[in-house]
């Protein structure tokens, strides 16, 4: 009887344990399913939209009545005059609806107007401390850059810092200059720089680089640098410096690494050993340091200019760099300068071109150039045509602070384009091929060039 009782008790205990185990498994399963469903719901809620804060410090430009500084050092834009118009830019990767707001404050009470295309909204600001004020909903019909125009309304002075963008559009991606890390507000307002690295023959010592640039009419705003002949130790091209001044610029970096030319030891300084008429010689800094030369020259859009660079090691641990420039139609060659670089023993390497905006006030204005008839000459005097180029972009574009850049090949020339907030983005690393211009092979008597 006792044994039967013990067996019954044992069976009951086993059943109870099994039931407890089942219960634990059951509720654990429910909990896991609950977590999964919650995660899916959370993911779905995130994908359904978002909020982005577009800082004025890196994304706003004063466009009317004339370009100028848009913000103070704290990234605050002040609306004082109804005649002034400011434009803020951000990019979306698909059509969407956005709700816009502004982090703003006013002295007393003031108002301002926000517009995307023909859609407009006006708000009154009466708080003295910065706070977000939502303006309204706007329809964005296509992917790409969105321009938001801001103008002052009635009342007192109004300030704003951030443009607030909200949207319920699923998976929407918004790009803009996100922060000022690494002085990115400055670089972002300038815009992305793009480059073409040319394919040259391997295993050959190269002495000369030749190329031509044509800037289309209307694609030459102030602050443009159309760099034709870049090499491992410097660069050579033409600039738009102001409404009345244009330059041909040739620079060579010192082997001493510094952004302050005054820090360069005497034995590592770039030495000018020759210059052309009216060419000025000086120093440069901030992006490395070295020797710089420039000729004030009224080059014009729509015309083709040619550039020639010689890189010649002297056999004494120094290398001589010489550049010439000319109007192709005039069949002219002007000596720009000749520089000696110490602690250097090299032939031409790293042949490339680039397109740059160097004025942060005008980074909203686009530019474009055509680079063609590109050649290198080896130390035996043989010419080699450069028909292939690899495209690249600086970190401003590579890190998606700005997306308005592209490049490519059009028949017998390459092209580069940047700034202007156009809705096309090139692909870094892409290789372009142009058709040959062998029928335009340069005929240059190097020994007769001005030196």
Each language-model region and where it sits:
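Carbohydrate-binding surfaces in secreted/extracellular proteins
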Residues: 299-333
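Activation corresponds to long, low-complexity, non-globular regions
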Residues: 164-222, 363-451
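Short, surface-exposed beta-strand/strand-loop-strand elements in extracellular ectodomains
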Residues: 109-119
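Secretory/extracellular carbohydrate-interaction modules
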Residues: 185-277
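A short beta-strand element within beta-rich, extracytoplasmic domains
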Residues: 92-106
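Glycan-recognition and processing domains
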Residues: 46-91, 161-184
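Short beta-strand-plus-loop segments that form exposed binding edges in beta-rich domains
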Residues: 149-156
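Extracellular carbohydrate recognition and processing domains
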Residues: 119-143
């Amino acid at each position: 009887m006792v044994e039967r009782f013990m067996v019954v008790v044992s069976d009951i205990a086993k059943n109870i344990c099994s039931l407890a185990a089942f219960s634990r498994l059951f509720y654990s399963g429910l909990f896991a399913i609950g977590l999964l469903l919650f995660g899916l719901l959370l993911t779905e809620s995130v994908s359904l939209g978002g909020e982005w804060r577009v800082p004025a410090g890196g994304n706003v430009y004063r466009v009317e009545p004339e370009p100028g500084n848009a913000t103070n050092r704290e990234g605050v834009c002040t609306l004082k005059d109804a005649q002034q118009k400011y434009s803020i830019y951000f990019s979306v990767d698909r059509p969407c609806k956005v709700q816009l707001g502004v982090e703003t404050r006013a002295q007393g009470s003031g108002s301002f107007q926000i517009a995307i295309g023909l859609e407009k909204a006006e708000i009154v600001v009466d708080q003295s401390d910065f706070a977000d004020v939502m303006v309204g909903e706007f329809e964005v019909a296509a992917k790409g850059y969105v321009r938001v125009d801001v103008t002052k309304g009635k009342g007192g002075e109004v300030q704003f810092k951030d443009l607030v963008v909200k949207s319920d559009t699923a998976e929407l991606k918004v790009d803009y200059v996100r922060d000022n890390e690494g002085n990115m507000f400055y670089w972002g307002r300038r815009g992305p720089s793009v480059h073409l690295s040319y394919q040259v023959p391997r295993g050959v010592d190269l002495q000369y680089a030749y190329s031509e640039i044509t800037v289309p009419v209307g694609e030459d705003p102030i602050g443009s640098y159309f760099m034709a002949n870049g090499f491992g130790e410097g660069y050579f091209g033409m600039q738009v410096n102001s409404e009345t001044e244009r330059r041909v610029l040739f620079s060579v970096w010192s082997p001493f690494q510094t952004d302050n030319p005054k820090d360069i030891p005497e034995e590592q300084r770039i030495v000018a050993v020759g210059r052309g008429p009216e060419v000025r010689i000086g120093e440069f800094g901030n992006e490395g340091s070295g020797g710089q030369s420039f000729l004030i020259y009224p080059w014009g859009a729509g015309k083709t200019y040619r550039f020639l660079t010689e890189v010649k090691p002297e056999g004494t641990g120094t290398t001589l760099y010489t550049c010439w420039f000319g109007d192709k139609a005039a069949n002219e060659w002007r000596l720009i300068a000749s520089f000696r670089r110490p602690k250097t023993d090299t032939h031409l390497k790293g042949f490339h071109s680039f397109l740059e905006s160097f004025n942060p006030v005008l980074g909203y204005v686009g530019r474009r150039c055509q680079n063609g008839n590109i050649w290198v000459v080896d130390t035996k005097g043989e010419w080699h045509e450069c028909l292939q180029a690899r495209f690249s972009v600086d970190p401003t574009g590579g890190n998606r602070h700005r997306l308005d850049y592209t490049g490519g090949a059009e028949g017998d020339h390459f092209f580069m384009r940047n700034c202007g907030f156009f809705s096309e983005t090139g692909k870094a690393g892409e290789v372009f091929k142009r058709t040959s211009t062998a029928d335009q092979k340069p005929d240059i008597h190097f020994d007769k060039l001005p030196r």
